[in-house]
Amino acid sequence: MPTVNPQQLADRIDTVLDILVAGDYHSAIHNLEILKAELLAQSQQNDEPGEKKQKAPWEI
């Protein structure tokens, strides 16, 4: 069962922030979408079937 490495996650977020500071919004969004997909894939490996997910409070 794979786990999230906090240091690797922080490094990837730093990379996205650097891309945003450089003004390349398209690449930053693309990198966030890749990261999200990878995290969701890991999360789905641990989910119970039929378990309902609640949205985070900051999601619209």
From Swiss-Prot:
Pfam families: YciZ (PF23675). Signal peptide: none annotated. InterPro entries: UPF0509. Belongs to the UPF0509 family. This is UPF0509 protein ESA_01586. It comes from Cronobacter sakazakii (strain ATCC BAA-894) (Enterobacter sakazakii). The lineage of its organism: Bacteria, Pseudomonadati, Pseudomonadota, Gammaproteobacteria, Enterobacterales.
